[in-house]
Amino acid sequence: MIPRERILSVLSKYDESDVKIGTICSHSSLQIFNGARREGLRSVGIVLRENKPYYESFPRASPDIFIEVDSYGDLLSEETQEELISENVIMIPHGSFVEYVGSENILERFRVPMFGNRLTLYWEGDRRRQRKWLEDAGVPTPRIYRSPEDIDRPVIVKLHGAKGGKGYFKASSPEEFYEKFSELKERGLVGSLEDVVIEEFIVGVRFYPHFFFSPIEGENIADLEGGRLELLGIDRRLEVIDEIHRGLPDLMEDFMDYTVTGNIPVIVREKYLVDLLRDAVKIISSSRRLFYPGLIGPFCMEMIYNPSRGFITFEVSARIVAGTNLYTDGSPYSYYYYDEPMSMGRRIAREIKEAVKSGSLHKIIY
């Protein structure tokens, strides 16, 4: 793993008057580039050659500079990394960046300074490690089954990493699990039982609150020292299975798919905001204990509300999530913090800009 000191050494050679924001042209990049533009920062997009014309077609959300690659794996080449460093680029991780480049490669081989704490990708990328994080935080979570033989009620089986629900399946018995697991194996999505996590299926309403934590701003919640926590939006994900009611009886199996295809805006009853913020505080506090300096910047708690059990957290995405694309002009919650449109992409850019002004860029980079 590249030590933080080495990344900060690279950062120390940057011309901070010309810092640029960079990311892969995918996932939430349009929002990130637009946010940089609104904050007066230039941006760099790493784009597949065949995709460049389409990203150029968005005049207010295309990057100022394109770096064309044949595959996203090229991002790890010395040539590409040196080009990014020479442009004073701070990379913004998102789901596609993590999935296409790989959290292990980012930790071991990617020398370009990144916004936030890249150790979060290590803890996020493996569901067993992430479960340790959630348990340390003390937030309610679904039961995890150590063996398929223990399945005694409906479960959902998930793959590791940022796969957007691809390959997930539901089972109610060991026999059903092995049948569907074998199908995944034939498709090459899994190799062994170590590649999946078996999780209790919780009935309820899904909520995905988007948070931003700044370690350079003043405290705004008494239970959370050393920074400011903001709730900038909430979404729920539109999965293929959500459209099952539209299928003909002989097509029902085609809809039994948890692949995320889009996002829908949501607000919660105001009394529940305290629950969301309280659990977010626990997640941040735990992250500091487990992987100092802990969470920095955007993150999302993936939750289900069950009437008898309250909010249950089944996952944390320790980066900007695609659901924030709903709020490129701000959300109902962002206006409680800012008297101007504030997307998550813009909030990232502002944090970087303010860190440069205050001489604290090193506090938000790894």
From Swiss-Prot:
PANTHER family registered for this protein in UniProt: 5-FORMAMINOIMIDAZOLE-4-CARBOXAMIDE-1-(BETA)-D-RIBOFURANOSYL 5'-MONOPHOSPHATE SYNTHETASE, 5-FORMAMINOIMIDAZOLE-4-CARBOXAMIDE-1-(BETA)-D-RIBOFURANOSYL 5'-MONOPHOSPHATE SYNTHETASE-RELATED
Annotated binding of ATP, by residue: 154-208, 239
Function of the protein: Catalyzes the ATP- and formate-dependent formylation of 5-aminoimidazole-4-carboxamide-1-beta-d-ribofuranosyl 5'-monophosphate (AICAR) to 5-formaminoimidazole-4-carboxamide-1-beta-d-ribofuranosyl 5'-monophosphate (FAICAR) in the absence of folates.
Protein family membership: Belongs to the phosphohexose mutase family.
InterPro entries: ATP-grasp, ATP_grasp_subdomain_1, IMP_biosynth_PurP, IMP_biosynth_PurP_C, IMP_biosynth_PurP_N, PreATP-grasp_dom_sf
SUPFAM superfamilies listed in its UniProt record: Glutathione synthetase ATP-binding domain-like (SSF56059), PreATP-grasp domain (SSF52440)
Enzyme class name: ligase
Pathway note: Purine metabolism; IMP biosynthesis via de novo pathway; 5-formamido-1-(5-phospho-D-ribosyl)imidazole-4-carboxamide from 5-amino-1-(5-phospho-D-ribosyl)imidazole-4-carboxamide (formate route): step 1/1
Catalytic activity: 5-amino-1-(5-phospho-beta-D-ribosyl)imidazole-4-carboxamide + formate + ATP = 5-formamido-1-(5-phospho-D-ribosyl)imidazole-4-carboxamide + ADP + phosphate
Keyword Transport: no
Molecular-function GO term, any one: ligase activity, forming carbon-nitrogen bonds
UniProt keyword annotation of Nucleotide-binding present: yes
Protein name as it appears in the record: 5-formaminoimidazole-4-carboxamide-1-(beta)-D-ribofuranosyl 5'-monophosphate synthetase
Cofactor(s) named in the record: Mg(2+); Mn(2+)
UniProt-annotated binding residues for 5-amino-1-(5-phospho-beta-D-ribosyl)imidazole-4-carboxamide: H27, S96, N263
Disulfide bond positions: none
Residues reported to bind Mg(2+): E302, E315
Any Pfam family the entry gives: DUF1246
Name of the gene: purP
Residue ranges of domain ATP-grasp in the record: 131-357
Domain of life: Archaea
Gene Ontology BP annotations: 'de novo' IMP biosynthetic process
